[in-house]
A protein has these predicted regions:
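Charge/polar-rich, low-complexity and marginally structured segments
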Residues: 1-103
Length: 103
């Protein structure tokens, strides 16, 4: 990914929505496919999906499942490292930029 592609992706991050899944099995399959694709849009969808699930489970007084933790860690590692390299900034700065643009 070039620097220009990375900057363009950050500016479109807000318009990328979480995956819409009817069943837990479907969510799991969609997350696996998104991570396997390594496409920035798909990775951000996985991250947003798991973040929504984290909020939902917190409202129920539950923790995030290990599988969901695994999905978000993988997606964040791939996406944040790719953007950090492309933009020549640290991973922490990438996380801050994603949060600023995606919210």
């Amino acid at each position: 990914m070039t620097k220009e592609q990375a900057e363009s992706f950050l500016h479109t991050a807000e318009s990328i929505h979480a995956l819409s899944c009817k069943t837990p099995k479907q969510r799991e399959e969609n997350c696996r496919e998104g991570i396997k694709s390594c496409a920035p849009d798909a990775l951000l969808q996985v991250i947003k999906t798991v973040m929504e699930r984290r909020e939902e489970r917190a409202r129920q007084g539950k923790k995030l499942t290990l599988l969901d933790l695994h999905f978000i860690e993988q997606a964040e590692d791939i996406l944040y490292e790719e953007l950090a390299i492309s933009l020549s900034i640290s991973r922490v700065e990438v996380e801050e930029k994603i949060k600023a643009y995606a919210s």
